[in-house]
Amino acid sequence: MVSSPCTQASSRTCSRILGLSLGTAALFAAGANVALLLPNWDVTYLLRGLLGRHAMLGTGLWGGGLMVLTAAILISLMGWRYGCFSKSGLCRSVLTALLSGGLALLGALICFVTSGVALKDGPFCMFDVSSFNQTQAWKYGYPFKDLHSRNYLYDRSLWNSVCLEPSAAVVWHVSLFSALLCISLLQLLLVVVHVINSLLGLFCSLCEK
């Protein structure tokens, strides 16, 4: 018995939607990471190397961005049966589904972990060292990383009083890394749906033969 056209169409439609959703999320992740490289839209910090290591890693660009976007293109091609996928067999479809799913999973997971660590460590900014060791000096670093007595994420009184430069460094950092965290989480959920859709399509194809 041949596989049902209805089953194949449903699986392909789901792949098209998933590909579009993952691709859109990847573009948003890349955009958020670009913004992290330009605090207050000022390129000076990037040129002077005054950016935190989490932003410089660029996981939103190559992880949640390029890797997920590549997977999204593969998934979309499978859904539209375009090019070499127009008459792809069962083995090729399964291999492509595993490859695209693994690629998107890895990229989204790297971006998710990096964003979580970045939120935990806090922003990279210029702060007054005297408020920590009684020495009058200013330097760039992570003022909230070793501040165990108070959590800056919940104590908003610290947001405008610790970081001297860039202005609104905490708001910029928290907003964009929170966005990256949510985007990568959404990507992970979409990858799970993609894997389930691929397995169901494979199962139905095998059962209906």
Curated annotation (Swiss-Prot):
Chief location of this protein? membrane
| Keyword terms of this UniProt record | Cell projection, Cytoplasm, Cytoskeleton, Glycoprotein, Lysosome, Membrane, Transmembrane, Transmembrane helix
Looking at the UniProt entry, the stretches that span the membrane are: 17-37, 60-80, 94-114, 176-196
Gene Ontology molecular function: protein homodimerization activity
Q: Which residues lie on this side of the membrane: Cytoplasmic?
A: 1-16, 81-93, 197-209
> What high-level taxonomic lineage is stated for the organism?
Eukaryota, Metazoa, Chordata, Craniata, Vertebrata
Task: Record the organism.
Answer: Homo sapiens (Human)
A GO BP entry is: positive regulation of osteoclast differentiation
InterPro entries according to UniProt: L6_membrane
Tell me which Pfam families the record gives.
Answer: L6_membrane (PF05805)
Q: Where does it sit, as one GO cellular component term?
A: lysosomal membrane
Q: What is this protein called?
A: Transmembrane 4 L6 family member 19
